Amino acid sequence: MLKRSLLFLTVLLLLFSFSSITNEVSASSSFDKGKYKKGDDASYFEPTGPYLMVNVTGVDGKGNELLSPHYVEFPIKPGTTLTKEKIEYYVEWALDATAYKEFRVVELDTSAKIEVTYYDKNKKKEETKSFPITEKGFVVPDLSEHIKNPGFNLITKVVIEKK
């Protein structure tokens, strides 16, 4: 009887210990690791390749600050066109990260632009390129020759209103 109880407990313990391992494996494999690289913190994943960092301050029509969300990074691909409409869409996502479905974008600041800074291997110096935000947009350049993870930064004020 004692041998049978010990055998039963051993089998039961083995089942529970293996179930926790298989759950961790299946949970970690459901995350698409190809698009992100792990940062210093285990819960932080940085996009691999080019990304658009949206860091905006939401103001009303009079310039009073309404919302200052955290920055949000969106993976983008070289060769794609970033239009004003698409950028406003990303800005609204950044606003939603702080105040979900509370605000909508009215307009971007007229001086808003997207900048990327990288070390140019050919010129052997640091370069900063600026891209104006227009209806036609601009094509995201391929900077993989110079930098692996170029960050295209949008840091501006944006006029917003409650939905």
Swiss-Prot record:
Residues 1-27 form the signal peptide. The keyword Secreted applies. Keywords: Plasminogen activation, Secreted, Signal. One of its GO terms (cellular component) is extracellular region. It is found in: Secreted. Pfam families: Staphylokinase. Its main location: secreted. Belongs to the staphylokinase family. Potent plasminogen activator that converts plasminogen into plasmin. It forms a 1:1 complex with plasmin, which in turn activates other plasminogen molecules. This is Staphylokinase.
